[in-house]
Amino acid sequence: MNDPYKAFCDDFYVNLRLGSQLNLPHSRETLLHFFERVQKEFPNMTRFRKADNGDLNLEEDRGNHSYRWAAIEAKRLAAGHVNPASIEEALKLHKLMMQLAPYHLGISPVEIDYLDILFGFDLAFTGNHDEIISESMFGSSPLNCLAEEGGARAVDFQPTVTVALTEDCRLQARIDVVTRTNSYQVRTGDYSEDVISVYLILRRYWGDHPKEPMENMIEEMATRADELCSSHIIPRILRPISNAIASRS
């Protein structure tokens, strides 16, 4: 599963999210011990910070093209690898997080709500993001009918689609397209360089309390996500968006 996405985006990342129905522990000793254990495996993760909302983050230097990060939120454990050399490389941190969670944070399968694997793609563009999505994603769709009105300008085209991949609906896949221009920019033509983001999220709900180790599930979900990207996301979403951006350069 080598990274095949460089030709279609400026940044690619693989994120992990483990949601709990209970608050995660936030005692000083527990948190420091957990982050020290992560740092032992990834010595370049040296930047520790606490956000205003109480979230705790340990990360590598974001100034580098490729970097890792890990976070403990109120009810969620999260991690990410931006521009990994391969999918396998990104999963090293994620598997470690799942191995440590039960023993260092006391996370029990009983409390788990969901497990997410997110493949993210950022495409830089200075201009009307929503216009790009309107043209590349909607085209002749009936949902694009308002764009046919005289003087109409796209200001909010952010589609999201979710499907169940299993009969019990516990494994679901979602596509989110996120734009970052606003009405002021459309009105004035004063655009700043920002990114259009495309997310493919595989979510495994935990109601049946699966017995398989979480690190194995992560690898299976990442493999499925990679297959979905090859068969659907690249040819039907990333390539049309990239072509629309290139047509304006």
Where are these regions (language model features)?
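Aromatic/basic-lined ligand-recognition segments
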Residues: L115-D190, Y199
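Short amphipathic beta-strand starts and helix->beta connectors
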Residues: M1-N2, R62-S66, A101, R180-V186
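C-terminal structured interaction module
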Residues: S197-S249
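A common structural junction motif
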Residues: Q39-F42, M98-L105, C229
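Internal, hydrophobic cores of structured domains that mediate oligomerization or house catalytic pockets
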Residues: I72-C145
